[in-house]
UniProtKB/Swiss-Prot annotation:
Gene3D superfamilies: 1.10.287.310
UniProt cross-references to HAMAP family, sorted A to Z: Ribosomal_uL29 (MF_00374)
Organism: Desulfitobacterium hafniense (strain DSM 10664 / DCB-2)
Domain of life: Bacteria
Annotated SUPFAM superfamilies: Ribosomal protein L29 (L29p) (SSF46561)
UniProt cross-references to InterPro entries, sorted A to Z: Ribosomal_protein_uL29 (IPR050063), Ribosomal_uL29 (IPR001854), Ribosomal_uL29_sf (IPR036049)
The name this protein goes by in its record: Large ribosomal subunit protein uL29
Length: 67
């Protein structure tokens, strides 16, 4: 998901999205451990999504405006 999409979300929506990413990451790691993971690159994408979401939330806390 693009950063612009995160910026368009409300804080509640952003928290739900981050929670969804965390659940997905848990499932992906479980699949990796059991050898059932089809796309290992997805783990990286999900981790970056979590980081982007948390960064946007923190910027809002500090009232930092980014383009």
């Amino acid at each position: 998901m693009k950063t612009k999409n995160f910026r368009d979300m409300t804080d509640e929506e952003l928290l739900k999205e981050i929670d969804g990413f965390k659940t997905e990451l848990f499932n992906l790691r479980f699949q990796l451990a059991t050898g059932q993971l089809d796309n290992p690159a997805r783990i990286r994408e999900v981790r970056k999504g979590i980081a982007r979401g948390k960064t946007i939330l923190r910027e809002r806390e500090l009232k930092i405006n980014r383009a």
